[in-house]
Amino acid sequence: MQKKRLKILMLNPPFLPKFSRSSRSPAVTKGGTIYYPLWLAYTTGVLEKAGFETMLLDAPAESLSLQETAKKAAEFKPGMVVLDTSTASIYNDVKVAEEL
């Protein structure tokens, strides 16, 4: 019998348009530059190498709403969700976590 792998959603949650959570000073960027979620990406690679099934979802980069993010998460059916957070967006991030 094949062992079922844990599915892990690595999420950079939705927030304000053009909000760069991964930058040195998380904020809405004037030029529209959004840094990719470096630490989530590193961790996703480590988890995949260890045999976990993962999905890295960068909601700000894809301009996803909370509803669209929740739909993608539900379709993936993760056993665990890892959320990237920042002080500037923490209340929103908690709300996203509660929705999922």
Predicted features by range, described:
Residues 1-100:
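A short, structured N-terminal alpha-helical element that caps or precedes a catalytic domain
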